[in-house]
Design a protein with these regions (language model features):
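Conserved small/polar residues in nucleotide/adenosyl-binding loops
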Residues: 1-4, 191
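Short Lys/Arg-enriched alpha/beta "domain-start" segment
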Residues: 12-16, 20-31, 37
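Conserved donor-binding loop and adjoining core beta-sheet/short helix segment
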Residues: 26, 36-108, 113
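Structured helix-beta-strand junction loops
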Residues: 27-31, 96, 160
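A broadly conserved amphipathic alpha-helix scaffold signal in soluble, globular proteins
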Residues: 87, 91, 107-114, 155-162, ...
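Acyltransferase donor/substrate-recognition loop-hinge adjacent to the catalytic core
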Residues: 119-189
Length: 191
């Protein structure tokens, strides 16, 4: 079990705003980590749903957010003493009366965590949250056999909804988007 710290250190988490783009991307763009969770546009777009906050601690960018009722953290991004920063996140979870949970941990991050704090974590894979990475040129043309299913899906959509249109997602449409997501979750059994 992880030891309990008596530290009074509080991580200065704050809400993400557009003004934080330079701070956040100064870490994420230098990182070799490439997943959608670190995209500034995703962080901003989903911040209201997950109550995502960030801080810079000991030259690491750290995030915490709520996944339903569970407080969760992302793997810190930066350089330096990762173990010390992890302990600070663990302590932050304790101060929130939550179990420490990290989401979005890839296999290379898992190896780092196991090397730094061996046998302290349980890892669970959920492919529903995996990133799928494609070349932009492949997605723009969808050429070849491997994209046949995607072409079929697009054609089925166009035939089913011939009058579809692109509209900007503005603040007055957010509730409509959330309602659509809730309806979709019910349809696939995740409500």
């Amino acid at each position: 079990a992880l030891p309990i710290s008596k530290s009074n250190f509080m991580i200065p988490f704050k809400d993400i705003t557009l003004a934080d783009k330079d701070t956040i991307t100064s870490f994420t763009m230098k990182s070799d980590r490439r997943n959608c969770d670190l995209s500034f546009s995703n962080l901003c777009s989903w911040r209201f749903l997950y109550d995502t906050q960030f801080a810079v601690v000991d030259n690491f960018l750290v995030f915490k957010f709520w996944a339903g009722e569970q407080l969760a953290y992302m793997m810190p991004v930066g350089t330096g003493d990762l173990k010390a920063v992890l302990w600070k996140l663990i302590e932050d979870a304790r101060k929130e009366n939550q179990h420490f949970c990290m989401l979005g941990v890839c296999s290379n991050m898992r190896a780092d965590l196991e090397a730094i704090l061996p046998e302290q974590f349980t890892f669970t894979e959920d492919r529903d949250y995996a990133d799928y990475i494609y070349l932009r040129s492949d997605l723009s043309t969808l050429k070849g056999k491997k994209f046949q299913a995607k072409r079929n899906h697009i054609n089925r959509f166009r035939n089913t909804y011939p009058d579809y249109e692109y509209t900007p997602i503005t603040p007055d449409r957010i509730q409509e988007c959330l309602d659509l997501e809730a309806e979709w979750c019910k349809e696939i059994g995740r409500a």
